[in-house]
């Protein structure tokens, strides 16, 4: 699998609506950067957050998730010490069948003890990316809404495209809008 360049990313965003909204250059002045980079795309975090809380003393169960585990926050977000938040990308993605994207956190946040996790973005998946953020520090951590949070690296198939894409298998997170909580197929 080859890594896709800024030229490929711009072409796919402009001609195939792979990323919307799309920023064709890196925006950096006075903010945490976002937009096209040499071999990736820095995504922004929206102003919607779900921060985990212990006020209801429920168990976090991925098979039976209780929405009382989270508090909704709009705007910049303060994640409590040693806590966790869910959020989403500003951008909506439509992945090509022959491409997989891997997401890595931005070093600006990582150097502050803020760890970003996103599972691979599979071929033909589309939607807003649900982003998981951990504050590993003993201090509150600020996340800036509508600024960069992570970078997507696009990997293209060398030969054959996949037999079954995310859309083909009707993946449970396909077409998600907003923050999507855990789901288990029943």
Curated annotation (Swiss-Prot):
<comment type="pathway">
    <text>Pyrimidine metabolism; dUMP biosynthesis; dUMP from dCTP (dUTP route): step 1/2.</text>
</comment>
<dbReference type="GO" id="GO:0000166">
    <property type="term" value="F:nucleotide binding"/>
</dbReference>
<comment type="subunit">
    <text>Homotrimer.</text>
</comment>
<keyword id="KW-0378">Hydrolase</keyword>
<keyword id="KW-0546">Nucleotide metabolism</keyword>
<dbReference type="InterPro" id="IPR011962">
    <property type="entry name" value="dCTP_deaminase"/>
</dbReference>
<comment type="function">
    <text>Catalyzes the deamination of dCTP to dUTP.</text>
</comment>
<dbReference type="InterPro" id="IPR036157">
    <property type="entry name" value="dUTPase-like_sf"/>
</dbReference>
<dbReference type="GO" id="GO:0006226">
    <property type="term" value="P:dUMP biosynthetic process"/>
</dbReference>
<keyword id="KW-0547">Nucleotide-binding</keyword>
<feature type="binding site">
    <location>
        <position position="151"/>
    </location>
    <ligand>
        <name>dCTP</name>
    </ligand>
</feature>
<dbReference type="Pfam" id="PF22769">
    <property type="entry name" value="DCD"/>
</dbReference>
<feature type="active site" description="Proton donor/acceptor">
    <location>
        <position position="132"/>
    </location>
</feature>
<feature type="binding site">
    <location>
        <position position="166"/>
    </location>
    <ligand>
        <name>dCTP</name>
    </ligand>
</feature>
<feature type="binding site">
    <location>
        <position position="176"/>
    </location>
    <ligand>
        <name>dCTP</name>
    </ligand>
</feature>
<protein>
    <recommendedName>
        <fullName>dCTP deaminase</fullName>
        <ecNumber>3.5.4.13</ecNumber>
    </recommendedName>
</protein>
<dbReference type="GO" id="GO:0015949">
    <property type="term" value="P:nucleobase-containing small molecule interconversion"/>
</dbReference>
<feature type="binding site">
    <location>
        <begin position="106"/>
        <end position="111"/>
    </location>
    <ligand>
        <name>dCTP</name>
    </ligand>
</feature>
<dbReference type="GO" id="GO:0006229">
    <property type="term" value="P:dUTP biosynthetic process"/>
</dbReference>
<comment type="similarity">
    <text>Belongs to the dCTP deaminase family.</text>
</comment>
<dbReference type="GO" id="GO:0008829">
    <property type="term" value="F:dCTP deaminase activity"/>
</dbReference>
<dbReference type="InterPro" id="IPR033704">
    <property type="entry name" value="dUTPase_trimeric"/>
</dbReference>
């Amino acid at each position: 699998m080859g890594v896709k360049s800024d030229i490929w990313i711009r072409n796919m965003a402009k001609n195939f609506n792979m990323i919307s909204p799309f920023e064709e250059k890196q925006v950096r002045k006075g903010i945490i950067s976002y937009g096209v980079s040499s071999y990736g795309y820095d995504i922004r975090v929206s102003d919607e957050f779900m921060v985990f809380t212990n006020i209801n003393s429920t168990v976090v169960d991925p098979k039976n998730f209780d929405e009382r585990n989270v508090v909704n926050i709009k705007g910049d977000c303060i994640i409590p010490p040693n806590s966790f938040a869910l959020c989403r990308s500003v951008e909506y993605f439509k992945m090509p069948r022959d491409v997989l994207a891997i997401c890595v956190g931005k070093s600006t946040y990582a150097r502050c003890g803020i760890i970003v996790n996103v599972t691979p973005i599979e071929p033909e998946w589309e939607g807003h990316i649900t982003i998981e953020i951990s504050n590993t520090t003993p201090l509150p951590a600020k996340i800036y809404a509508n600024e960069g949070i992570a970078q997507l690296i696009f990997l293209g198939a060398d030969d054959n495209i996949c037999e079954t894409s995310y859309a083909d298998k009707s993946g449970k997170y396909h077409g998600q809008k907003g923050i999507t909580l855990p789901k288990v197929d029943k």
